[in-house]
């Protein structure tokens, strides 16, 4: 159990505070809920307010979400900058407003042909590996003048986001499928899928009579990238480079730094529909996150030491080396006496209708005697 007991003394006696828990939870976020929904579930399970997460996942996405509580929330700033690994499915041949299956399909013509797997992999190696420039979708959590970009986009306002540099360490194609899907909605099931290195001749012509269907190509990929990379933007840009359009239909984060979805202490969760009445008196149904083992959440947590070791770079040293480091640090610490500031005696200006006299006071008293020197209205006398 991860807890510490703190006590404080007062005039009344010794007061015992409630145990303070600190640590990290690696949660497998379910589809259909936000990252904030998961944080709310952890708050309820631990009965704590000080809970946060590192790296937001879209509602459509699943996978690793690192949640910190107590003093361990300080580690989240380090974790959010770690590189990440994703498994994703990119659908080529259709575009959406959000660059994923949550958005609306944008109008477009059928693709007359589709590239082979080899051609796609060559383009990825040339244009989408290493350091690249990426423009996030307007339906993102990026702030523009203090407001979230997705809020502005939903209000119908024009949002222009600047390109940002990101690093793609790995962009591997695991499988390629050709098939057709409904042309009136995003994320529809792929029908007649064929796993192949390239599309067969006459394949598109065979589905032409089905007016409500559209030929598409799907890629199952693995991407390892720097913090701040949008995988749906990769799907969009890859589709544009191929002249087909593209969007994301599946996204799963499998790793954040040293935190992996395959760790033995990963905590699972699921989405649960809940209906409630809002302030306007209307019934609203939405999903919420529910931890599968909420009563034993602390059993899945990493303690502060293990959390720090997984969050930051560590150097193992022996007991003697640790003692030497402490001794060296103490020897370098010197006390510097603060400098005493010497205040100068102020100069007091006395004004009259026809003369200005400056008198600097001595230690005993201020001199207010008029000057023996007569000056015009543009001169002054200072007595020291």
Task: Give the location of each predicted region.
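Accessory RNA 3′-end/elbow-binding domains used by RNA modification enzymes
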Residues: 2-30, 36-53, 57, 123, ...
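Active-site-proximal helix-loop elements at catalytic-domain edges
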Residues: 6, 16-38, 91-117, 159-164, ...
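Short glycine-/polar-rich loops that comprise or flank the Walker A/P-loop
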Residues: 22, 62, 83-86
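Glycine/acidic-rich beta-strand-loop module
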Residues: 50-80, 138-139
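Acidic, low-complexity central loop/insert segments
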Residues: 72, 78-136
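Non-catalytic interaction surface on structured domains
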Residues: 124-128, 132-145, 149-232, 237-244, ...
């Amino acid at each position: 159990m991860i807890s510490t007991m703190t006590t404080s003394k007062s005039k009344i006696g010794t007061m015992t505070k409630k145990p303070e828990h600190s640590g990290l939870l690696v949660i497998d976020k379910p589809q259909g809920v936000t990252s904030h929904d998961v944080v709310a579930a952890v708050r309820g399970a631990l009965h704590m307010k000080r809970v946060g997460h590192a790296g937001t996942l879209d509602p459509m996405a699943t996978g690793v979400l690192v949640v910190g509580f107590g003093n361990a929330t300080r580690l989240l700033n380090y974790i959010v900058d770690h590189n990440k690994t994703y498994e994703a499915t990119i659908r080529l041949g259709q575009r959406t407003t959000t660059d994923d299956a949550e958005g609306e399909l944008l109008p477009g013509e059928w693709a007359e042909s589709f590239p082979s797997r080899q051609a796609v992999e060559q383009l990825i190696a040339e244009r989408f590996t290493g350091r690249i420039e990426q423009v996030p979708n307007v339906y993102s959590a990026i702030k523009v003048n203090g407001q979230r970009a997705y809020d502005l986009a939903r209000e119908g306002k024009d949002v222009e986001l600047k390109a940002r540099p990101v690093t793609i360490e790995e962009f591997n194609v695991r499988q390629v499928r050709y098939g057709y899907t409904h042309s009136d909605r995003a994320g529809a099931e792929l029908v007649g899928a064929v796993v192949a290195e390239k599309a067969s001749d006459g394949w598109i012509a065979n589905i032409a009579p089905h007016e409500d269907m559209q030929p598409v190509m799907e890629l199952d990929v693995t991407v390892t990238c720097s913090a701040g990379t949008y995988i749906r933007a990769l799907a969009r840009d890859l589709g544009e480079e191929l002249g087909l359009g593209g969007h994301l239909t599946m996204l799963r984060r499998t790793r954040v730094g040293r935190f992996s979805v395959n760790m033995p202490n990963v905590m699972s969760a699921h989405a649960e529909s809940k209906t409630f009445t809002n302030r306007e008196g209307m019934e609203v149904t939405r999903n919420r996150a529910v931890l599968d083992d909420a009563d034993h959440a602390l059993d899945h947590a990493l303690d502060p030491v293990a959390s720090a070791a997984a969050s930051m770079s560590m150097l193992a040293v022996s007991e003697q080396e640790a003692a030497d480091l402490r001794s060296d640090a103490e020897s370098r610490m010197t006390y510097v006496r603060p400098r005493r500031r010497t205040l100068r005696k102020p100069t007091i200006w006395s004004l009259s209708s026809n003369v200005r006299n400056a008198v600097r006071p001595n230690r005993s008293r201020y001199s207010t005697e008029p000057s023996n020197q007569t000056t015009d209205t543009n001169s002054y006398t200072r007595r020291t």
